[in-house]
Amino acid sequence: MATKKPKKTTAKKRSAGSSKRVTAKPKKVAAKKERVQPKRKPGSKASKAGKVSGGKVKGQLRVRMYRIGFGDFFLLTVPTKIGPQHILIDCGVHAGDIKSMKACVQDLVKETKRNLALVIATHYHADHLSGFASNFDEFAQFNVGMVWITNRLDPSNEGASKFKAQIASLSSQLQLRLGARTDVAGQQALAKVQNALGIQLGTTKKEGDNEKALRLLTSGFKNKPPVRYYQGGQTPELPTVLKGAMTCELLGPAPLDSGKEFAGSDNKKEQYLAAAADQGVPDECLTPFEKHWPATSADYPRAAFREYRTEEQIELDQPGSPEALERLLRAAQPDVLLALADAVDGTLNNQSLVVLFTCQGKKLLFVGDAQWGNWSYWLYGKKVSGADPGISERAKEILASLDFFKVGHHGSTNANPIPAVAALNPKCAAMCSTESSDPDGKRPYGSIEKETEVPRIKLMDEMEKRTQSRLVRSDWIGVLEVKPSPEAKGQLAKLPPNFSKGDLFIDYVFPK
């Protein structure tokens, strides 16, 4: 018996010390859990809350908003049983660039150790993509679990690819026409067009920032992760390390065949304007565009078509053809160029992926730059005209349950509809990545006089009230040589509960 005892002890020690056996066991357990998990009842609490069943999660649920100027760069940290996992949502800046992008990417490297579970590119705008391009070599060293991109950029979709090419062609022509403008409105319109192209006027670069960013996202990361193209209503595939730790629902963009992407990038009735919406000129005067382009007085500023009369309406034999666009541009009055720039900007914004995460019972909504066409798809579930019929019960349920809201389009009035803000959970925390003034003290976009300033002051005030002062803006902190926005008014002297600031970012940690 004395000889058997040592054998038993040795066997135990060998079992504990063998890396092969220890590694094999967790793999089997993990595989078993993945097979069992989908058998949960859809209505069960664990399924709804996005909780990890069994074991102890490590880390805290946190959103980090990097301070890069007028653009989006968000890092969502998700606690899991194998430790914190990271989701990067957009990385770009355009107008209002405060030159902190490189430093922020280095902080991302330090925080994630070049490992990202998921990267999401919401839409094709430089202020959401340019950081990937300007830091291409750094990002090329990252290991990524999966990449999600709006399906409007899916190269296998012929219709989407054709429309993307048309937008690029129109943007290039607009860039040339607007390049000579020295007025503020013209320069802001030029900035919108360059945001769509990802390339500055007069540059010798053969590849724009947006295309370079797409190249990184689709094939440039170190481990060549799988890429998925999504639209609203689809059930996205989560990377393995996030399965069981969270759930995700895609609310936008509208399906490609719904027509709502082009139903209108604006709806002034749903905006935070001081006065009633302009009546403008009769709608029948405003139809020089093919049906893809919004063409009613609600979609364009009154001045955009001041030179038009019904009898002088432009007739196009083949709407949407390159020749038709050329003719339209040649005949365009200056304000029509501005309206076209707005249309390009709004159309790309409406292609934004709108992502609803649920983790540890908390709900987080990231809306990209979604404007009216995108919002109306899931707010109402049907085409809306005339009087507001009231948002759907499903939309009310989502908005009333939110614990975190990423303010749309940097605080623009055309991307945060009145009924959506009114339906927000009053205890919801909100972050707005924006820049109210560039280094010269000018606004990157819009004007207070025309009620188009970004961020829209009236909207920000309403968001403050609705969230009970749980709204924080990125331009409220100084970064590097850049001072806080004059609109900060000492807002960050005392941060709202669970917010904290670093040299380059603002964090929000969810209370347990």
PLM region descriptions:
Residues A121, S130, W148, V367, ...:
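Long, structured stretches of catalytic cores involved in phosphate-ester chemistry, encompassing
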Residues G96-K99, E158-Q166, P439-V454:
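Short, flexible/disordered intra-domain loops and linkers
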Residues A2-K4, K8-T9, K13, K20, ...:
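Flexible, acidic/histidine-containing loops and adjacent segments that form or flank the divalent-metal
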Residues I68, V78-P79, D90-G92, I149-D154, ...:
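Short loop/turn segments at strand-loop or loop-helix junctions that form parts
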Residues G55-R114, Q173, L348-S376, A430:
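Conserved beta-strand hairpin/beta-sheet module of binuclear metal-dependent hydrolase folds
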Residues F74-L76, H86-I89, K99-M101, S130-A133, ...:
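Short, solvent-exposed loop/turn and secondary-structure capping segments
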Residues P79-I87, H94-V147, E393-S412, P426-A430:
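Active-site metal-binding motif and surrounding structural segment of the metallo-beta-lactamase
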